[in-house]
Structure formats: C-alpha cells, structure tokens
Amino acid sequence: RRHTRSFHVTGVQTCALPISARNPGLTQDEITQNLCDYLGAEKVVWLPYGVYLDETNGHVDNFCRFVAPGTVMLTWTDDRDDPQYERSAAALEVLRSTKDARGRELEVVTIHQPGPITITQEESEGVDAVAGTLPREAGDRLAGSYVNSYIGNGVVVLPVFDDPHDEAAVATYTRLFPGRRVVPVPGREILLGGGN
C-alpha cells in the first residue's frame, strides 16, 4: 500500500509534492504514472516544497490547491525572512512556468498565510501527545494555512485564526466562489492537533 494523500486534483490535472518518505521504493516517474492511472489525470505538476513545518510531511492541500480548472491557490508570505517565502516563491515559479493538461497557462492566486502562529505555554500544557505525534512545545510554530479549506455544495468552510489576514482570506474565497457561502471556522484547535 502506498500513501498518496499529497495530491490535489481538478479533473484533468494533478498537483503533487515529491515526498519520497511517503512512497518509499517508488520513483517520481512511477508515482506520476500511478496518479495518472488511478485518478485519470493527464498531467502531474511536482512542487519542490510544501508549507514550512508541516508535520504531515507534505500534504499539498495545506499549501496549494486547484480552485477552478486552470486556477491554483497558493499559500504566500511577503516576508522574505520567513522560511515559507522561499518555499512559496519556488512553487510560484513552477506554477507560472507550467501549462495545464489543456495547454493553458495556470492562473495563480496567492493567499497570505496567517501568523506565523506559535504555541502558547498554556496550549503546550494542554496537549496530550500520543505515539506518532510531534510534541507541542511553547513557542513552536504551527503550519497554519487558509488554503486547506473544505469546498462543498454551496459552501466553503475556511479555517481562520483570529489573525489580521483572516478578513482578506474570506474576501479572496468569496471572490473565487461567488455561488457559495463562505463560512469562517476557528482553526487553532485543529492546528494544535496537527491538522488544519
């Protein structure tokens, strides 16, 4: 059994991260072929990195996602001193130089990340670590992102973090999904548990 959660699909194209730890023994070409065979994808776009400190080892849905055919949302920061900047800039370069399976240039919508979000002492003391999870120490950075939302029939459920960027994230989703109601949901507790 191979782990393949590090992909996001838009019907005719797939975006993926090259995380060899998730698929030991398979080459990038073999993973690409499997994604095409099993998902019916015509093209795979490999991104060099994911969200900084993402403990899931590279779930692309916390970093980059298709929001419409030919349109990709990407986690972004303007802070060049933030380790996320290099990761997002590298992905932006790949995405802007890539055509989709229909030969169209990708439209990339950047959405500023929250934070950085760090764990408080109180939160650290309140987390019961279980086998296979990372410890939660006060001051540790969490991999918060607005990209990892749920898009359903008539609705988009969007994690928010009581952050100055929350309002812009809601506005971006409202613009991109005019036929859906955008529902902001506090995401910090989920983030503390290793998700988003």
Give each language-model segment a name.
Residues 2-15:
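Single conserved hydrophobic/aromatic residue that forms the stacking wall/gate
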Residues 1, 16-196:
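The feature marks the mature, well-folded catalytic cores of soluble enzymes
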